[in-house]
């Protein structure tokens, strides 16, 4: 027996309803998100991270469709670490030295104690060293560390209590003196004479550069290599010269995600990708362009000619690591306090 045919109008309505239901149940494309990260960094990385942030944001947008904005905070490395410990919600920190990041674990449990093992090269995607920036023509004839303690030489360096760069400066000088004179006591005497030639201690490396370059104070600036090369680029080689000392320290600025912050904010994936980007070919190229020494062999070879030849020693070789160096030299009552309170 044949069933009566349904009216055409009802068939169309049923078809429309089925289509609507199917569309309702179909998965919707993910909506693009706007993400903000805070990178708390040390003083002279401003130009570098401006380039990194632009390149990473473009890559992340192409890969995920999400818009990521990276905000920057810059200052003396020790001061920056204390700000994070006191509650500044950094998704990542890119500081001047490992001890300052260790403090985030030791004092606030913001990161695990083994944070430095999570990325290659002890979580340092680039390196640097300490050189001398002098006025054009080097009128005071400064060639090596022993020239810095001569009478009448004005030496500009920041305060090691607040600046990571200043601690690298201090240890570079100490390491040279210890090698030359053979004892800790003589090294301390040398550093005391050097500090006696320092007219002012700025809180960070960029402030010290401003004092030397813009205010015209002093005869020589103890500087991050990248900061000295940037000064030549921006201000012109007709105003300053770089002097590479015979021996200096290998500065290894490390990076990490701040676990408690990224887990609270839900930003771990993008924060980790941001740090991984520093190790990528593009990130390494940007490091070289901004006068940091890349750790990737091909990038290091590409930019090798822009860096002076310097014999380098490491913090582990000369001082037994950052924890020991900090306690001996920069903690309350350490050698810096012993020297500077007598100044």
Language-model segment annotations:
Residues 2-14, 25:
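Twin-arginine (Tat) signal peptide motif
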Residues 32-162, 337-342:
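N-terminal segment of the mature folded domain
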Residues 40-42, 134-136, 154-180, 195-198, ...:
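Short beta-strand->loop
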Residues 129-138, 252-269, 286-290:
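A bilobed periplasmic-binding-protein/Venus flytrap-type ligand-binding module shared by bacterial periplasmic
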Residues 137-143, 162, 175-183, 261-269:
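Short helix-loop capping/hinge motifs at secondary-structure junctions, enriched
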Residues 180-246:
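Ligand-binding pocket segment of bilobal, Venus flytrap-like solute-binding proteins
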Residues 262-343:
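Extracellular/periplasmic juxtamembrane helices and adjacent flexible linkers that interface
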């Amino acid at each position: 027996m044949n069933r009566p045919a349904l009216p055409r109008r009802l068939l169309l309505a049923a078809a429309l309803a089925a289509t609507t239901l199917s569309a309702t149940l179909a998965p919707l494309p993910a909506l693009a998100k706007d993400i903000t990260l805070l990178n708390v960094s040390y003083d002279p990385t401003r130009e570098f991270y401006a380039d990194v942030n632009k390149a990473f944001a473009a890559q992340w947008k192409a890969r995920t469709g999400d818009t990521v904005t990276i905000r920057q905070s810059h200052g003396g490395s020790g001061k920056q670490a204390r700000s994070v410990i006191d509650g500044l919600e950094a998704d990542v920190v890119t500081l001047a030295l490992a001890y300052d990041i260790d403090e985030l674990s030791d004092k606030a449990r913001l990161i695990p104690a083994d944070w430095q093992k999570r990325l290659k090269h002890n979580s340092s995607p680039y390196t640097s060293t300490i050189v001398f920036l002098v006025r054009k023509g080097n009128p005071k004839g400064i060639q090596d560390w022993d020239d810095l303690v001569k009478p009448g030489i004005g030496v500009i360096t920041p305060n090691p209590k607040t600046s990571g760069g200043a601690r690298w400066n201090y240890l570079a000088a100490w390491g040279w003196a210890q090698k030359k004179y053979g004892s800790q006591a003589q090294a301390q005497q040398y550093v005391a004479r050097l500090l006696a030639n320092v007219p002012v201690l700025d809180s960070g490396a960029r402030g010290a550069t401003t004092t030397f370059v813009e205010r015209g104070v002093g005869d020589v600036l103890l500087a991050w290599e990248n900061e000295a090369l940037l000064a030549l680029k921006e201000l012109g080689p007709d105003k300053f010269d770089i002097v590479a000392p015979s021996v200096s320290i290998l500065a290894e600025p490390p990076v990490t995600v701040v676990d408690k912050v990224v887990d609270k904010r839900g930003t771990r994936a993008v924060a980790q990708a941001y740090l991984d980007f520093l190790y990528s070919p593009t990130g390494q190229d940007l490091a070289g362009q901004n006068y940091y020494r890349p750790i990737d062999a091909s990038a290091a070879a590409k930019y090798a000619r822009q860096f002076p030849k310097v014999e380098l020693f490491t913090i582990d070789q000369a001082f037994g690591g950052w924890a020991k160096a900090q306690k001996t030299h920069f903690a309350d009552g350490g050698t810096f306090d012993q020297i500077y309170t007598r100044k």
